[in-house]
A protein has these predicted regions:
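Pocket-lining segment of extracytoplasmic ligand-binding domains
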Residues: 1-65
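An extracytoplasmic/periplasmic, membrane-proximal ligand-sensing/linker region
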Residues: 56-135
């Protein structure tokens, strides 16, 4: 399949998925859902900004400064992806594409022996927070 790179670093290609995100313990989720929703809204704003090709140069400067690398290398890497906005991410959330990415990632972990058994991805991916932040 076609490769996808999200501003949140979610990368999918063919039968592999390298989903990356933010993690927190269940107790934190229960006590701070409002903070997680606000944080996710901020990530969505960053996705909207970072997905616009007109902003690649500026964003590459930020990334280069933070990572201690040169801007040209960051810009070159930006060409390797299809940076999406939050509207597209929410579409993937709604149509099950995003869930499928995480299920694929989990299958790869099982196949590699990194985890023992399958669990519902809803047990560790906060789809409800993503959805609420998109309202």
């Amino acid at each position: 399949g076609a490769a996808q790179i999200f501003c949140s670093s979610l990368k999918v290609s063919g039968e592999t998925a390298d989903c990356q995100g933010w993690g927190c313990l269940p107790g934190y989720v229960e006590a701070n859902k409002d903070i997680l929703v606000r944080f996710t809204k901020a990530l969505y704003k960053a996705m909207d900004y970072g997905s616009q090709e007109a902003n690649y140069d500026e964003v590459a400067g930020y990334v280069a400064d933070i990572c201690g690398t040169d801007k040209a290398s960051v810009l070159e890497q930006a060409k390797e992806g299809n940076w999406i906005d939050n509207k597209t991410l929410l579409q993937y959330l709604g149509d099950g594409t995003l869930k499928n990415y995480y299920e694929t990632q989990q299958k790869n972990f099982i196949d590699a022996g990194d985890i023992d058994k399958e669990v519902p991805v809803e047990d560790y991916v906060l789809f409800d927070v993503m959805e609420e932040a998109g309202k």
